[in-house]
Every structure is written in C-alpha cells, then in structure tokens.
Amino acid sequence: PGLLPTPVETASALAAGARSGLLASDVVASLTRAGQGFALGALLGSALGFATGYLPRLSAAVTPLVSFLRPIPAIALVPLATAWFGIGETAKRLLIAYAVLLAVWLYVHDGVSRVPVSHLRAARTLG
C-alpha cells in the first residue's frame, strides 16, 4: 500500500493540473515533440525507402543494416540516447524519429521496389 496513488488521488491531481493550466501546456509540449519526431522519421524513412527501393545497389548495402536495427525497440535505446544527447528534447525527438523511420522505410522500400519497370518507362515517356 502507498506505492501508487489511488484512483481518487489521480483524478484530483488531473483536475488540479487542468485548473492550473499545467496539464494543457504539458499536452501541447508532448504533442509538439511527437509531431516533430514523426515528421523527421517519416521524411528520412521516405527518402531512404525511395532511394533503396529504386537503386538495387543501395538497397543491397542498406537493407542488412536496417534489418539489423528493426527488431531493436526504441525503448531499448533510451540509455544510449540519454548518454549521447542528455535528457533534453533532442534525445526524445530522435527516439520517436527512430521508431517511425524504420516502419516508414520498410513500407516505402517495399512499395517502390514492386513498381513494374513498364510503369517507370511509361512515367518517363509521359513526363
């Protein structure tokens, strides 16, 4: 007993945070951080996915590294990110970006690599 707050204590703390405005500012900060990390991860994952999907040599070089990193959850990299970047916003955004990048890369790479060559030729011809 006493290790965790009771539901009543949790609800009263939530209400106090909402009244003081602290809850709203913390939610905005969290959503901003998540959005920035997602945007960075999606941008890098898309660029890498297009490049590796379109260029077989680059795919052969990058795919083993990404396949090695994919099973490592972002939460497992928290100690490493903290050691390298500290406990500030940079480490948090980069961990979110890491989690997003690998998923986006996988789907973009797969989609681009499956485009038939005839469709690429037609697109080049049509401008």
Which residues fall in each region the model found?
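Periplasmic/extracellular loop-to-transmembrane helix junction in inner-membrane transport proteins
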Residues: G2-A39
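Alpha-helical membrane-protein architecture signal
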Residues: A11, S20, A24, V28, ...
